[in-house]
């Protein structure tokens, strides 16, 4: 999860987030090289005493500055498109969970089970226990099995919301009357925090999301106790 004065991304917990972090580093390297080249050319232009007032055109230079940006854009676009397709691909999910956004809480329904549904509200600051996180804890966590593909169906009952968990590389809009889907896969157990990422009203900041990823046998015990 995030911590104070953090400069980088949160630790990746899912294959998608690992791909996104690699793509971030790949794109940042390209941006750094371009910025260095541009600054170098600007410094040469400001310091050189050579001039070419009689030069009207330069076919070679124009060809280079047309082809080179096209190649750079392709190098950025190809891995980006690959990740987009990976994020939309859902193959044989082990579990389906429907998430509904409300002003200002989330409700969850495990569609593979009968009567396994609940609302998830933020715990007020005055009710927090020692060690719990302000504005991030909820009364009912979303318990999911780790190392299994899980399909999240996301929608809204009222206004636009956005269901986001950064460490899992998830951010899906919750739109009234529309059902969006996303895949959740965690490589390790733990608590993973997120928040509504679409301004949805006065209490937008008080819609946290907490996923509790556990081994499959613990999830089966939890689901049996909830039914």
Curated annotation (Swiss-Prot):
The keyword Methyltransferase does not apply. The chain crosses the membrane at residues 15-45, 60-87. It catalyses: 4 Fe(II)-[cytochrome c] + O2 + 8 H(+)(in) = 4 Fe(III)-[cytochrome c] + 2 H2O + 4 H(+)(out). Mg(2+) binds at residue 198. Component of the cytochrome c oxidase, the last enzyme in the mitochondrial electron transport chain which drives oxidative phosphorylation. The respiratory chain contains 3 multisubunit complexes succinate dehydrogenase (complex II, CII), ubiquinol-cytochrome c oxidoreductase (cytochrome b-c1 complex, complex III, CIII) and cytochrome c oxidase (complex IV, CIV), that cooperate to transfer electrons derived from NADH and succinate to molecular oxygen, creating an electrochemical gradient over the inner membrane that drives transmembrane transport and the ATP synthase. GO terms for cellular component: mitochondrial inner membrane; respiratory chain complex IV. This is Cytochrome c oxidase subunit 2. The gene is MT-CO2. The modification Phosphotyrosine is found at residue 218. Binds a dinuclear copper A center per subunit.
């Amino acid at each position: 999860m995030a911590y104070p004065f953090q400069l980088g991304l949160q630790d990746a917990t899912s294959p998608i987030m690992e791909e996104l972090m690699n793509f971030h580093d790949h794109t940042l390297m390209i941006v750094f090289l371009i910025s260095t080249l541009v600054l170098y050319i600007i410094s040469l232009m400001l310091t050189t005493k050579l001039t070419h007032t009689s030069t009207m055109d330069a076919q070679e230079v124009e060809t280079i500055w047309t082809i080179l940006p096209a190649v750079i854009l392709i190098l950025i676009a190809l891995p980006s498109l690959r990740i987009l397709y990976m994020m939309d691909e859902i193959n044989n999910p082990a579990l389906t969970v429907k998430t509904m956004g409300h002003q200002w809480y989330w409700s969850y329904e495990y569609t593979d089970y009968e009567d396994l549904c609940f609302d998830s509200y933020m715990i007020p600051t005055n009710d927090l226990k020692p060690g719990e996180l302000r504005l991030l804890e909820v009364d009912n966590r979303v318990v999911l099995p780790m190392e299994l593909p899980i399909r999240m169906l996301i929608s809204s009952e009222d206004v636009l919301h956005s269901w986001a968990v950064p460490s899992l590389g998830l951010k899906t809009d919750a739109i009234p009357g529309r059902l969006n889907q996303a895949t959740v896969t965690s490589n390790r157990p733990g608590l993973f925090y997120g928040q509504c990422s679409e301004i949805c009203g006065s209490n937008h900041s008080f819609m946290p999301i907490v996923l509790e990823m556990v081994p499959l046998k613990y999830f089966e015990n939890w689901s049996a106790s909830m039914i």
